[in-house]
Structure formats: C-alpha cells, structure tokens
Amino acid sequence: DLAGWMTAAAMANTLGSVIDLTLVESEAIGTIGVGESTIPPLLLFNRLLGIGEADFMRATKATFKLGIKFENWRDVGETYFHSFGSVGKDHWSAGFQHFWLHGLQNGHTHSLDDYCLELKAALEGKFAHLPDERMNYSYHIDSGRYAAFLRQRAEADGTKRIEGRID
C-alpha cells in the first residue's frame, strides 16, 4: 500500500531512532491501479527522505510531467490542461494578471496561457531541468514500484512489517 509505505518511510527517516515502527499490511488486498499521477509536492517529499531523482525515476519507471490534462472537462470533447506552473511574473506593485488585463483592454491579444512556461513546454512536448530550478514539474510513476522502493528504505531505517489485516 503506497500510502502506508510513504508514511512509514517518512516516520522511519525522521523519527526512526526514537520510535519503534510497525506497518501492518495484507498481501490479500491487491494494489489498486498501477500508474500514479503525482503533483509537485512529491519532489519535496523525496528530498525529505534523501531520495535522489535519478534513483527514484529508475526505481519507479517515472516520466516527467508538467501538468494534468482533463478530457471532457465541461463538455464532451473539451479539454483543460492544469499546468503546474505559474503565469507571468508579479511586480511589487501588482500581480501579473493585472498587467495582462490592462493589455487586453489596450488591444493585446495574447492568452494568459502564453505566459506559463510549463504549459507552453507541455503542449510542445518539451522539458528541461533549468539551472535556476524554476520549472515546476512532477512525475507519472508505477505506484507499486514506488511502494516497494519506499518499503525497502523504511525497513532499512528500522520499520517492521507484519502480514495481516486490521478490521
């Protein structure tokens, strides 16, 4: 169970020397789903655990993603892409959207979406690690492989596993 092993790995990593941690898990309860669409906070979670990105990607067969595409969003055939990025750059005097709206009122025709790096890159199928780490991204992973990866780390940090069910 991914949620259980995420919790165990985090607790074992941060509190392992002061607690005894046991995870109860049943092999009889199958894994629900295989592919997992993640969001950017997973990068922070992995950093908390000291997991390097290359090791994580290899272990989970991860691919990069810059947002989530929703098909048939409001109507059949309509799509919506929720980018992980921010739009434009705020100024000390006002948020970017105020400048963009002012531009629209004065004949500017660019969509607000044109000012989101992650959205533009996703729509063009491009990705790069930028030196300033300003690209917001996440991963699509094999959740079963991630659970196994975290289990290995949690057990190495002292977590014990018991086969069973709690009713």
Pin down the residues of each PLM region:
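Glycine-rich FAD pyrophosphate-binding loop
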Residues: A10-V34
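A conserved short coil-to-beta-strand element within the FAD-binding core of flavoproteins
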Residues: K160-D167
